[in-house]
Amino acid sequence: MGSFSITHWLILLVVVVVVFGTSKLRNAGKDLGGAVKGFKEAVKDENTEHAKKHVVLDHDAGTNPPNITGTQSDTTSANKVDDTHNV
């Protein structure tokens, strides 16, 4: 009762072809296929960009990171303050 038999599907197909015509259905199929192809290419491009970023990050991880603690600049600014008080 809940599922359709093959005859119901064939009748539905005939009604759709009569209402929309074969040319509109063919164009809709081409458009749908193009959209799916574009989506797959976008996902593929996103995956390759993501993989390239990981390669670059892994390559950078092997080098010594720069000293970004700021201790050198803090000592020079402290020396400048001390120099002004000593004068």
UniProtKB/Swiss-Prot annotation:
Q: What is its main location?
A: membrane
Ranges annotated as biased composition (Polar residues):
64-79
Which is one GO molecular function term here?
protein transmembrane transporter activity
Any one GO biological process: protein transport by the Tat complex
Query: What InterPro entries does its record include?
Result: TatA/B/E (IPR003369), TatA/E (IPR006312)
**Which ranges does the record mark as transmembrane?**
1-21
Superkingdom of origin organism: Bacteria
Annotated region described as Disordered, given as residue ranges: 56-87
Q: List the subcellular locations.
A: Cell inner membrane
The answer, when asked if Membrane is one of the entry's keywords, is yes
Key words of the record: Cell inner membrane, Cell membrane, Membrane, Protein transport, Translocation, Transmembrane, Transmembrane helix, Transport
What family does the database annotate? Belongs to the TatA/E family.
Q: How does it assemble?
A: The Tat system comprises two distinct complexes: a TatABC complex, containing multiple copies of TatA, TatB and TatC subunits, and a separate TatA complex, containing only TatA subunits. Substrates initially bind to the TatABC complex, which probably triggers association of the separate TatA complex to form the active translocon.
Q: What does this protein do?
A: Part of the twin-arginine translocation (Tat) system that transports large folded proteins containing a characteristic twin-arginine motif in their signal peptide across membranes. TatA could form the protein-conducting channel of the Tat system.
Q: What is this protein called?
A: Sec-independent protein translocase protein TatA
Q: Which organism is it from?
A: Psychrobacter arcticus (strain DSM 17307 / VKM B-2377 / 273-4)
